[in-house]
């Protein structure tokens, strides 16, 4: 009997030991898998051709996006994203350019993100992220008025909402599963990079000259903030929470407008027929931004709303200097115009929703007051964006017959102040990681606004995206 008991005890101990070893082995294997360097990315080919005139090429981009993600320990990780691109068309103007491969075959390398994240830093509820990072704020779809920490990447004007990463320190403190607070410090602000190619002048304001003057030449200089804590720093904080299925946040940013203002124009006569040259000084205004957003779902319908109050720290004044026309005047001859009044904050906001139907179709609708480049209450326009798409053949084929926007710049004279953007699209998933997209975009309207200025750029677009 004792022998049977001892054998039973030994068997139980052996089985328990085996189970523990198996569990330890599984944990070790899982930990090893999590600590492995994860490499992912995509290859993107993006070509566009104009539909008018001689069908000139409008865009040519071949991009490899490479992402590295490694969890070094259970309390830290490294992440980076790098773009290697062949972008644009050769701009060869002389035989000397043929000796420069960067001109014959233009390419660039861009570090989009590169940071280290530490979990449980100093206290178990605090995470810190240091390095170049994309800090995304806001609940709206791509167009977020509260997303103001990172500079806009406006290179492709049709890629709404794209930003560059910033060198920053970001801390997240988690009160519990529902509430957290984020603080961000960016030591030096960066301006937005402007559109390129045929879109280069899309955001440039229309220049109104005094009667009788003809512009012969234009030049400008940029006055960047000094690189010190007082001038170049950007900082912000955001309280985020969830209450009864509603995600919300309140935020504040002490930053700079990423698009410059023309603060001084010097007019110089060049002939007796009214021809002039203009030299402009451009600078970046300091701005306080108070934001709020929310998102929820009701009966399967997604809703979101987002708003930002922009408060200029000082009046933004443009000075036109006509002293060159009056060489005998003992004092400068200037005229000032108020571009932004610090006592009159302005609000940009977005409201929208989306819904997935049982038949595989999807609809997305947004209304936005104030686009990226618009500043001041009297300059904010209204934008309606709509997209409807439907999937077929187990989601391999996606057709979006309705897509685009309707823009109103003056409701009192809407017939002469509107724009229409129509962008139908068809995409096909050839494999699980390869998608081909064909689309066209048409612009029309009257007046003076961003999309009316692109009326001559109706285009056909081809994209191939291969993910790995």
Regions from the PLM with identified roles:
Residues 69-201, 244, 445:
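Outer membrane beta-barrel
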Residues 37, 74-78, 124-128, 178-181, ...:
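Repeated loop/turn-to-beta-strand initiation elements of outer-membrane beta-barrel proteins
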